[in-house]
């Protein structure tokens, strides 16, 4: 259980007796962080770790349903958004997630961000951007002739249709983010 909760006694004891730096600081000292690297899950990132990821242009792929299955805490999605970190949305795999429906993870991230105090009205748009361009960026596929994750002249047409009622642009984006799961 020592790796499952930042607040467990074994985790805090290990951190207090560690080498004086986080795993993010450690891999940064090795020169690993950068735009050609992404962090999976990003659950136990403190403010300094998040700042370091921003400084190195390293994206974080958030997989909140997988975190629940394997017993991890929720990612600090509200902090990532408020502080301007590059995020992507992931499902992990069927070995640790009930399905590969990316929009289920988007909906959960929406609820988590709100519960963590992120109140900006851009939440749905930013999470859908994380699920599209954010994912392409994290995988190094957002630039070049075969770029993905964006509707743009010259980009690869990699699209899906989500069956939701179309109202205003803002309301439709909100509906896709919060209720689009299972409607692709």
Segments the model singles out, each with a brief description of its role:
Residues 1-59, 71-87, 146:
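Histidine/acidic residue-rich metal-binding segments in metalloenzymes
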Residues 31, 81-87, 110-117, 131-143:
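Alpha-helix capping/termination and helix-coil
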Residues 39, 53, 60, 92, ...:
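Divalent metal-coordination and catalytic microenvironments
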Residues 42-45, 65-67, 92-94:
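Active-site beta-loop-alpha junctions enriched in small/polar residues
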Residues 70-73, 80-104, 151-157:
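Short acidic/histidine-rich active-site segments
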Residues 88-94, 112-123, 175:
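Short beta-alpha connecting loops at secondary-structure transitions
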Residues 126, 133-137, 141-145, 153-159, ...:
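Mid-to-C-terminal alpha-helical segments outside catalytic/metal-binding sites
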Residues 156-184:
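C-terminal cap of metal-dependent C-N hydrolases
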């Amino acid at each position: 259980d020592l790796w499952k909760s930042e607040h467990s006694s074994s985790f805090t004891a290990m951190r207090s007796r560690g080498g004086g730096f986080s795993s993010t600081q450690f891999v940064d000292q090795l020169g690993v962080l950068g735009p050609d690297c992404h962090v999976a899950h990003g659950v136990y990132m403190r403010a300094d770790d998040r700042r370091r990821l921003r400084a190195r242009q390293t994206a974080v792929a958030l997989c909140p349903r997988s975190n629940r299955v394997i017993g991890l805490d929720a990612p600090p999605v509200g902090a990532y958004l408020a502080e301007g970190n590059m995020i992507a949305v992931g499902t992990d795999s069927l070995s640790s997630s009930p399905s590969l429906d990316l929009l289920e993870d988007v909906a959960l991230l929406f609820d988590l961000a709100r519960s963590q105090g992120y109140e900006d009205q851009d939440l749905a748009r930013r999470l859908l951007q994380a699920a599209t361009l954010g994912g392409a960026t994290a995988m190094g596929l957002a630039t070049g002739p075969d770029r993905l994750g964006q509707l743009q002249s010259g980009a690869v047409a990699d699209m899906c249709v989500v069956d939701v009622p179309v109202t205003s642009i803002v309301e439709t984006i909100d509906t896709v983010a919060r209720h689009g799961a299972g409607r692709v």
